[in-house]
Amino acid sequence: MRYLATLLLSLAVLITAGCGWHLRDTTQVPSTMKVMILDSGDPNGPLSRAVRNQLRLNGVELLDKETTRKDVPSLRLGKVSIAKDTASVFRNGQTAEYQMIMTVNATVLIPGRDIYPISAKVFRSFFDNPQMALAKDNEQDMIVKEMYDRAAEQLIRKLPSIRAADIRSDEEQTSTTTDTLATPARVSTTLGN
């Protein structure tokens, strides 16, 4: 019985390791982005902390913004906006439920290449109980913190697509340069008198 349990456990480990299964909330960050500079207007703000945490969870080494290295990709965090819309109302017309929408803009600068804009949008809703103002504020703070974490996860998940776009632009550049080199010069075939 013990032998069978060991065999089944070993088989389960081999199957999950062999099929490319990964732990939840981890992303295959491209090898060219394993060392990065995180640039933010608010380096100790909630979004910067969430992105820094996600980058470290995904094995990315972060360099100081003032580093002298110019060959390292840079993730620049931009504007964050949080909008709050009414989702439902009570019979008396007061708001019963809000939907919050967080939009985060960022850019990835790959030295010698291009600047790639990325963005993330996170939606959450919460109930507005007017009789529990303090609890409502605490719940809203927790929801906003969770939204920052989800936005950071979305931004990190978009890094592999940036690498793919970078490779695609390289291929397009090489194909256009080879096309212009391979095109023969125009030769006139008219006979003059």
Curated annotation (Swiss-Prot):
<comment type="function">
    <text>Together with LptD, is involved in the assembly of lipopolysaccharide (LPS) at the surface of the outer membrane. Required for the proper assembly of LptD. Binds LPS and may serve as the LPS recognition site at the outer membrane.</text>
</comment>
<protein>
    <recommendedName>
        <fullName>LPS-assembly lipoprotein LptE</fullName>
    </recommendedName>
</protein>
<keyword id="KW-0998">Cell outer membrane</keyword>
<feature type="lipid moiety-binding region" description="S-diacylglycerol cysteine">
    <location>
        <position position="19"/>
    </location>
</feature>
<dbReference type="InterPro" id="IPR007485">
    <property type="entry name" value="LPS_assembly_LptE"/>
</dbReference>
<keyword id="KW-0449">Lipoprotein</keyword>
<dbReference type="GO" id="GO:1990351">
    <property type="term" value="C:transporter complex"/>
</dbReference>
<keyword id="KW-0472">Membrane</keyword>
<comment type="subunit">
    <text>Component of the lipopolysaccharide transport and assembly complex. Interacts with LptD.</text>
</comment>
<dbReference type="GO" id="GO:0009279">
    <property type="term" value="C:cell outer membrane"/>
</dbReference>
<keyword id="KW-0732">Signal</keyword>
<dbReference type="Pfam" id="PF04390">
    <property type="entry name" value="LptE"/>
</dbReference>
<dbReference type="GO" id="GO:0043165">
    <property type="term" value="P:Gram-negative-bacterium-type cell outer membrane assembly"/>
</dbReference>
<feature type="region of interest" description="Disordered">
    <location>
        <begin position="167"/>
        <end position="193"/>
    </location>
</feature>
<dbReference type="GO" id="GO:0015920">
    <property type="term" value="P:lipopolysaccharide transport"/>
</dbReference>
<feature type="signal peptide">
    <location>
        <begin position="1"/>
        <end position="18"/>
    </location>
</feature>
<keyword id="KW-0564">Palmitate</keyword>
<comment type="similarity">
    <text>Belongs to the LptE lipoprotein family.</text>
</comment>
<dbReference type="GO" id="GO:0001530">
    <property type="term" value="F:lipopolysaccharide binding"/>
</dbReference>
<feature type="lipid moiety-binding region" description="N-palmitoyl cysteine">
    <location>
        <position position="19"/>
    </location>
</feature>
